[in-house]
Amino acid sequence: MIEIIPATDIIGGQCVRLTHGDYASRKTYYRDPLEAALRFEEAGIRRLHMVDLDGAKASEPRNLAVLERIAARTSLEVQYGGGIKSREALHSVFDAGARRAICGSVAVRRPDLFAAWLAEFDPGRLILGADVRNGAVAIEGWLESSTLSAPELIGRFIPQGLTQVICTDISRDGMLCGPSAAFYADLQGRFPTVEITVSGGISSMSDIEELDRQGLRSVIVGKALYEGRITLKDLARCLPNA
């Protein structure tokens, strides 16, 4: 069964959700993200997706204290993104307890640097963030667009051993309108050696079941979980031995 990965987006140390990546649309769900993380862990979740939205805008991680608390108080494997654009920032994220680091803008602006990281670290610890708006990869906290498509960006790093990609359909992010299942199935088919993680638009377990039928291996769920459309019991159904 496809793995569900809860999303925890952080602004000012609090757990929030945005719509279309618009910072002005934020809604706070937990003042202490650790509370959410503990609930997910209790439900049997293994991975947590954490995005430092302050860091994405500032071009450097800004909520490492939140990461440190969750890493220290839970056994969750945290994948952390937002503002990781230097080797120092990457090390700080790992030192704070992240199991994996998500890199997007740096892979577009400094592909040689990201390729070097794939060579230096276990490629399984680095996730390429290939988030798309109108077919183009968006960068800098989704505030700018590049000239690359997701397949073009992913293809650059296959020779370096890339194994994991998170692809968010920004047009559907926070909209609870269902994912672009055909798009993701095509992307997974093009890159069979890479785990393509779906993100954006998930509204129900039916959406997730369709992605599972299409051969996707993991999916990030945010607003549907916080709004109660998908429950903790639903999460438990997707555990490996459920």
Report each predicted region and the residues it spans.
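Conserved beta-strand positions in the central sheet of alpha/beta enzyme cores
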Residues: 49-52, 79, 102-103, 127, ...
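Conserved anion-binding
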Residues: 12-25, 91, 98-173
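Glycine-rich phosphate-binding active-site loops on the catalytic face of alpha/beta enzymes
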Residues: 92-113, 169-172, 200-207, 214-234
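Glycine-rich, proline-tolerant flexible connector loops at the mouths of alpha/beta enzymes
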Residues: 47-65, 105, 167-177
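Conserved, mostly hydrophobic/aromatic
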Residues: 9, 40, 48, 93, ...
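Glycine/small-residue-rich loop that forms an oxyanion/phosphate-binding "nest" at active or ligand-binding sites
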Residues: 54, 60-121
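Catalytic cores of alpha/beta
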Residues: 74, 78-100, 182-218
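Charged helix-capping and loop-helix junction motifs
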Residues: 61-68, 143-152, 177-185
